[in-house]
Amino acid sequence: MSEMSLIMLAAGNSTRFNTKVKKQFLRLGNDPLWLYATKNLSSFYPFKKIVVTSSNITYMKKFTKNYEFIEGGDTRAESLKKALELIDSEFVMVSDVARVLVSKNLFDRLIENLDKADCITPALKVADTTLFDNEALQREKIKLIQTPQISKTKLLKKALDQNLEFTDDSTAIAAMGGKIWFVEGEENARKLTFKEDLKKLNLPTPSFEIFTGNGFDVHEFGENRPLLLAGVQIHPTMGLKAHSDGDVLAHSLTDAILGAAGLGDIGELYPDTDMKFKNANSMELLKQAYDKVREIGFELINIDICVMAQSPKLKDFKQAMQSNIAHTLDLDEFRINVKATTTEKLGFIGRKEGMAVLSSVNLKYFDWTRL
């Protein structure tokens, strides 16, 4: 059995997919798509090493200790070149995680022809009449190239060292004069590029798990500036001491959302040692944090917030706070609840030295079946 490693390309921006979630993080059952695709291929062969390119290594590492991860580049070729630095096996298989349903039959066809050329690649024939600039092309000569592809590692590295932009491994090796061998591709190995492609693939649907997060934040009164809660001005001069605008509710809610998704906390994302967050709009930071959560495949179910303050009274502001949160997070207002309480004059809150906020949220996997 030939020594071979596997590279899975999962660092793309999913621009053409055109949704809030990156397609590599769509959930198939409980697995993100990148993991589902990698598990599928890795079950077919005892790979020496499995390398996954990533735009979020810290998060992806939470799913498995069996793979190596490397930060992707700006292009496919750059990502592949970086991943190849970790490969020393004679052969390397490269695939896009967006090709989720590669079959064992296709995999075996690639392996069976390993000695035929420098790169073995699956390809589909074109059945329909094909035009280029209104001129009919000879469809018998057209091939739709797919992945996974198997290449001789040293030759693929040499091909990519030309620093030219190739959209797949076979064209890079062909440009070096290498021999390409085509095997029959399959419809199931078509790439998930546009959200409409989801309807063409028989994929497992997301599980119905719920993820709960809590956030707690405290700030001291003392700044002669507006007191903001959820971006709503509560008082013109009772501001809270903070590196940002002091919106303690926004900070608490941000932490709750990050926690439910497993993305750390607000201090990691927006450190108070970074001057670019000085006097920052906390509701804008909340939106950015939720965008990151949505990118990795989650969406909010509901929010419950308890503001603890002896003063000022907040009854008349709760509706405005709920509305502003709904607008910022693109969430139905009936899914948001803001409560206010005192501490019956006990503790630092009762002494009117500061205020605190406790937020709880529930997240679920993004339901891509609605697309």
Curated annotation (Swiss-Prot):
MF-aspect GO terms: 2-C-methyl-D-erythritol 2,4-cyclodiphosphate synthase activity; 2-C-methyl-D-erythritol 4-phosphate cytidylyltransferase activity; metal ion binding
A Pfam entry, by short name: YgbB
Residue sites binding a divalent metal cation per the record: D217, H219, H251
Region of interest (2-C-methyl-D-erythritol 4-phosphate cytidylyltransferase), ranges: 1-210
Binding-site residues for 4-CDP-2-C-methyl-D-erythritol 2-phosphate, renumbered to this chain: 217-219, 243-244, 265-267, 270-274, 341-344, 348, 351
Site (Transition state stabilizer): R16, K23, H243, T342
Reactions that this protein is recorded to catalyse: 2-C-methyl-D-erythritol 4-phosphate + CTP + H(+) = 4-CDP-2-C-methyl-D-erythritol + diphosphate; 4-CDP-2-C-methyl-D-erythritol 2-phosphate = 2-C-methyl-D-erythritol 2,4-cyclic diphosphate + CMP
Renumbered residue ranges of the record's region 2-C-methyl-D-erythritol 2,4-cyclodiphosphate synthase: 211-371
Parts forming coiled coils: none
InterPro entries reported in the protein's UniProt record: IspD, IspD/F, IspD/TarI, ISPD_synthase_CS, MECDP_synthase, MECDP_synthase_CS, MECDP_synthase_sf, Nucleotide-diphossugar_trans
Cystine pairs: none
Entry's family note: In the N-terminal section; belongs to the IspD/TarI cytidylyltransferase family. IspD subfamily. In the C-terminal section; belongs to the IspF family.
UniProt protein name: Bifunctional enzyme IspD/IspF
Gene encoding the protein: ispDF
